[in-house]
Regions:
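Zn2+-dependent metallopeptidase catalytic core
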Residues: 50-72
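Disordered inhibitory propeptide/activation segment of secreted metzincin zinc metalloprotease zymogens
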Residues: 1-43, 47-49, 59, 206-218
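Acidic helix-start/capping segments at beta-turn-to-alpha-helix junctions
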Residues: 39, 43, 71-93, 155-162
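Active-site recognition of the HExxH zinc-binding catalytic motif
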Residues: 120, 132-147
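Sec-exported extracytoplasmic/periplasmic mature domains
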Residues: 60-68, 141-148, 182
Length: 219
């Protein structure tokens, strides 16, 4: 259930900046995207074993949420998310991109993500540590349509380009992830609706829950 006590918390502006963005590399990112189906991952066996092991541990750190399910499969035909090692050269595609790793997602007509592929050139990425770090980061981006922010100085956040490997998920990343899937809805909440909701919620106080549920219309 949505925690309405945190609607206007300090994380609201952070959430807005990571999800509702517009730049030269995107036609329009003002519509939030969520995974509309359980994410079933197939990990390419050509990815180094140590990297695969670290990634499976990382996935176990992702917060549990009623609107988001994730699992692994050993059968590629059962997966809707393929993480692949490639020998191809991978170029920059967006300002979020680094060479040698990228992802592409399939969405339905309600902007729900239903499938994806993450490609990485493990050899060109260099060290095992670099492979682990970037796989974690790019996979996390793909779950929530998040983007990196240069303003994040913390080495603990996956959304920082200064991120270093950790055995835990930062509170910052956890709150943003949970917030994103709290906003899960059949009809996406566009940028102007999000801003309107935030303004009205601050005015309504204890009646905020009723108002917010009306904004998350399933009709």
């Amino acid at each position: 259930n949505f925690d309405f006590s945190k609607i206007d918390s300090k994380y609201n502006n952070a959430y807005r900046s990571h999800v509702y963005t517009y730049d030269k590399d995107y036609e329009n990112r003002l519509i939030p995207k969520h995974w509309g189906r359980p994410v079933v991952i197939y990990l390419d066996k050509k990815i180094p074993k140590e990297v695969r092991k670290d990634f499976m541990f990382f996935v176990s750190l992702i917060p549990k949420h009623q609107n988001f399910k994730i699992s692994f499969t050993k059968k590629i035909n059962e997966a809707n998310y393929y993480i692949k090692n490639t020998s191809e050269f991978i170029e920059h595609k967006t300002s979020d991109s680094l060479p040698q790793i990228t992802y592409n997602l399939i969405t339905d007509n309600t902007y729900k993500m239903i499938g994806g592929i993450l490609k990485m050139n493990c050899q060109s990425l260099g060290s095992l540590e670099n492979n682990k770090k970037l796989l974690r980061q790019y996979f996390f981006l793909s779950l929530c349509q998040f983007c990196f922010k240069n303003s994040i100085e913390s080495e603990n956040s996956l959304l920082s380009k200064k991120y270093i490997l950790s055995n835990s998920l930062s509170n910052y990343d956890s709150v943003l992830f949970i917030t994103h899937y709290n906003y899960y809805n059949k009809v996406p909440m566009k940028f102007d609706q999000f801003n309107l909701a935030q303004r009205n919620i601050k005015k309504l106080g204890n009646n905020a829950a009723t108002y917010f549920k009306s904004m998350l219309s399933y009709e």
